[in-house]
C-alpha cells in the first residue's frame, strides 16, 4: 500500500542522510 511505499522512501532518505553525515563526500 501507499503507507509501506512512503515508509520505504523515508527509510532510503534516512539511510542516505546518515551515510552523508558519517562520510561527507
UniProtKB/Swiss-Prot annotation:
BP terms from Gene Ontology: defense response
Tissue-level expression: Expressed by the skin glands.
Function: Antimicrobial peptide.
Assigned protein family: Belongs to the gastrin/cholecystokinin family. Magainin subfamily.
Keywords assigned by UniProt, alphabetized: Amphibian defense peptide, Antimicrobial, Secreted
Lipoprotein found in the keyword field: no
A GO CC term attached to the entry: extracellular region
Localisation per UniProt entry: Secreted
Name recorded for this polypeptide: Xenoposin precursor fragment BM3
Amino acid at each position: 500500500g501507499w503507507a509501506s511505499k512512503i515508509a520505504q522512501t523515508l527509510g532510503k532518505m534516512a539511510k542516505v542522510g546518515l551515510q552523508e553525515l558519517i562520510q561527507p563526500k
